[in-house]
């Protein structure tokens, strides 16, 4: 039986939700990773995070397109974001929304596993238990939270979708036009193909920062660097 389609009605609001954490005032970049492939299923005796390489036969058997199952893209995106100096400076907040609409809060202090196998195990735990806590205390490092994502974004924040089909901009110049003392929200796809516009109807504009298609991780790397330069984070 394939899982992952449940609602998040049992989820709590994260401790750092808008209005409840003074540190949130320091956040300057909020990233929503949309359309992430996060689907679990029982294969053999255990529940696993489905991916196109390991579970190709299972996916064919259930008439699924293996090309759609790329959770490794989310892994790459999270490593790029959370390893960035911007995150280490406390100026970044990340949310994940899966293809099935499951919304996940990511604590900036989490250390994402370096290997995909361990990352997959982490995500199975989060999807089934609705959260994962720090080993040395009750702090939630990842937590399934209630939709819509806009409930967790600062009121009045500018919301921008990233797409190769969007208006082409020089990213450093574009970031320089955003208010320096207010957070902005960038919505970036974490899927193998397609776009985020149809699911990110809460955004106000759509931009591209390369004339060439970029992987999610490459696009996010550029975004973090642009913000680091803008804010003087070395």
Model regions: which residues?
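Intrinsically disordered, low-complexity basic segments at termini and long loops, enriched
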Residues: 1-5, 203-204
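RNA substrate-binding interface of SAM-dependent RNA methyltransferases
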Residues: 4-170, 228-233
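Preference for well-ordered, secondary-structure-rich cores of eukaryotic proteins
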Residues: 8-9, 179, 207-208
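Short coil/turn segments at secondary-structure boundaries
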Residues: 43-46, 173-175, 198-201
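Short, well-ordered alpha-helix to beta-strand connector turns
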Residues: 156-157, 182, 203-204
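Strongly charged, low-complexity linkers/loops
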Residues: 168-178, 185
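Loop/turn-to-beta-strand initiation segments
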Residues: 182-186, 190
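Structured adenosyl-cofactor binding patch, chiefly the S-adenosyl-L-methionine
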Residues: 192-234
């Amino acid at each position: 039986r394939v899982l992952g389609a449940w609602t998040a009605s049992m989820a709590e609001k994260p401790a750092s939700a808008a209005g409840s954490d003074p540190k949130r005032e320091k956040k300057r970049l909020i990233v929503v990773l949309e359309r992430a492939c996060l689907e679990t299923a029982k294969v053999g005796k255990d529940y696993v995070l489905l991916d196109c390489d390991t579970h190709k036969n299972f996916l064919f058997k259930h008439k699924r397109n293996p090309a759609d199952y790329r959770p490794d893209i989310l892994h790459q995106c999270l490593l790029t974001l959370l390893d960035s100096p911007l995150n280490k400076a406390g100026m970044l907040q990340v949310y994940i929304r899966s293809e099935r609409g499951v919304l996940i809060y990511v604590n900036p202090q989490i250390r994402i596993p370096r290997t995909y196998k361990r990352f997959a195990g982490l995500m199975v735990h989060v999807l089934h238990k609705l959260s994962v806590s720090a080993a040395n205390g009750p702090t939630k490092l990842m937590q399934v939270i209630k939709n819509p994502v806009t409930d967790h974004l600062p009121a009045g924040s500018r919301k921008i979708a990233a797409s190769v089909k969007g208006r082409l901009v020089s990213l450093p110049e574009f970031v320089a036009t955003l208010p320096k003392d207010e957070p902005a929200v960038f919505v970036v796809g974490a899927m193998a193909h397609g776009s985020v516009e149809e699911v990110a109807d809460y955004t106000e504009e759509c931009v591209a920062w390369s004339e060439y298609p970029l992987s999610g991780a490459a696009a996010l790397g550029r975004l973090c660097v642009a913000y680091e330069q803008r804010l003087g984070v070395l």
